C-alpha cells in the first residue's frame, strides 16, 4: 500500500507513527516532531507524526483532553508545514471527519469505536488513509468485518492496528498471533506498542501503564512481522498530561528503534509460512 509517499507492507521496512498522546502545546508538538523526524531520518525509517487534539475517552471527566479541534488542527497543520512530516490524528465524531481530513494525512479511529459501522464508513469515505485500532474487546478475526466495512466505501488505504486485548479488569494482554490473523484483512498491520502496556483505569481516576514492557512487546511484534509501529512518546513521560505511564521516553527512542530495525531486517528476509496455513500439512 502506498502511504504518505512510501510503501507499507510486509515486503518493506516498518514505518513509525509516533508522538505525544495529546497535543499539550504548540512548542512541545514542534520540538517532538523535529526530534522524531531527525531520528527517523538518521535510521531511514518512514515517519508519521501522531498527536490527538481531543482525548474523548479519558477515564475521568476532570482529566486533560487536549486543546480541542480548532486549535489542535492549527498546531498539526503547523507541524506538517514547518517540520515537513505527514501527520495522523484520531477523530471521534462523524461530524468532524471532513474538517480533520482537510489537515491531516492519515485518519485514525479509536479502538472503542471500531464496531460503529456508520462512523467507520464515514471516516473511510473521506478518502484518506485510515488506521483502524482494534477494540480491546474484539477478536482479531473480527477485524476482517471492520476492514471490509471500510473498504466498501471504495477506500483501499486501510490499516488495522493491534493495541492489546482486555485481560480481566484493568489489564491488557497482547496475543502476537493476532498480528498474523489480521493480515487476512489484506491491510497493513500496525502494532501499538505503548497502549498495549496500558492498565486501563488502573490508577482509579486515570489509566496506569507498565512502560518497562514497551520494548518487550515491540520486539515481539516486529519479530512476528508487522508493517508499522505506533508508539506514543514524550520528552518527560512523568509530566505528560495524558497516558504518561505508557509513553516511551523520547530520549530513548533512537536506541529502541535501532534494535527493532535489526529484528525487522532479519524477519523480512524470510518467508511467513503462517500466511499459507493450507500448505502446512
Curated annotation (Swiss-Prot):
UniProt cross-references to InterPro entries, sorted A to Z: Aldolase_TIM, DAHP1/KDSA, KDO8P_synthase
A molecular-function term among this protein's GO annotations: 3-deoxy-8-phosphooctulonate synthase activity
Main location: cytoplasm
Localisation per UniProt entry: Cytoplasm
Pfam families: DAHP_synth_1 (PF00793)
Keyword annotations of the record: Cytoplasm, Lipopolysaccharide biosynthesis, Transferase
Entry GO terms, CC: cytoplasm
Pathway participation: Carbohydrate biosynthesis; 3-deoxy-D-manno-octulosonate biosynthesis; 3-deoxy-D-manno-octulosonate from D-ribulose 5-phosphate: step 2/3; Bacterial outer membrane biogenesis; lipopolysaccharide biosynthesis
SUPFAM superfamilies tied to this protein: Aldolase
Transferase listed as a keyword: yes
Endpoints of the signal sequence: none
Reactions it catalyzes: D-arabinose 5-phosphate + phosphoenolpyruvate + H2O = 3-deoxy-alpha-D-manno-2-octulosonate-8-phosphate + phosphate
NCBIfam families reported in the protein's UniProt record: KDO8P_synth, PRK05198.1
Stated name of the protein: 2-dehydro-3-deoxyphosphooctonate aldolase
Source taxonomy: Bacteria, Pseudomonadati, Pseudomonadota, Acidithiobacillia, Acidithiobacillales
Amino acid at each position: 500500500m502506498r502511504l504518505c509517499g512510501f510503501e507499507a507492507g510486509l515486503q518493506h521496512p516498518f514505518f513509525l507513527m509516533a508522538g505525544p498522546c495529546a497535543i499539550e502545546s504548540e512548542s512541545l508538538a514542534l520540538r517532538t516532531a523535529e526530534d522524531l523526524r531527525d531520528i527517523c531520518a538518521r535510521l531511514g525509517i518512514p515517519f508519521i507524526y501522531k498527536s490527538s487534539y481531543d482525548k474523548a475517552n479519558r477515564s475521568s471527566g476532570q482529566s486533560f483532553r487536549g486543546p480541542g479541534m480548532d486549535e489542535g488542527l492549527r498546531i498539526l497543520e503547523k507541524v506538517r508545514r514547518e517540520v515537513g512530516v505527514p501527520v495522523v490524528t484520531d477523530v471521534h465524531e462523524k461530524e468532524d471527519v471532513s474538517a480533520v481530513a482537510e489537515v491531516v494525512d492519515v485518519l485514525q479511529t479509536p479502538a472503542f469505536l471500531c464496531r460503529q459501522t456508520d462512523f467507520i464508513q464515514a471516516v473511510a469515505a473521506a478518502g484518506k488513509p485510515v488506521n483502524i485500532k482494534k477494540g480491546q474487546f474484539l477478536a482479531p478475526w473480527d477485524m476482517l468485518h471492520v476492514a471490509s466495512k471500510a473498504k466498501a466505501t471504495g477506500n483501499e488505504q486501510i490499516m488495522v492496528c493491534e493495541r492489546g486485548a482486555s485481560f480481566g479488569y484493568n489489564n491488557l494482554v497482547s496475543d502476537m498471533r493476532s498480528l498474523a490473523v489480521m493480515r487476512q484483512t489484506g491491510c497493513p498491520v500496525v502494532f501499538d506498542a505503548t497502549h498495549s502496556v496500558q492498565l486501563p483505569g488502573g490508577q482509579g481516576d486515570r489509566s496506569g501503564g507498565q512502560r518497562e514492557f514497551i520494548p518487550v512487546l515491540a520486539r515481539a511484534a516486529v519479530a512476528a512481522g508487522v508493517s508499522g509501529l505506533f508508539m506514543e512518546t514524550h520528552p518527560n513521560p512523568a509530566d505528560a498530561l495524558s497516558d504518561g505511564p505508557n509513553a516511551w521516553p523520547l530520549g530513548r527512542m533512537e536506541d529502541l528503534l535501532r534494535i527493532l530495525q535489526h529484528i525487522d531486517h532479519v524477519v523480512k528476509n524470510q518467508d511467513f509460512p503462517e500466511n499459507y496455513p493450507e500448505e502446512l500439512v
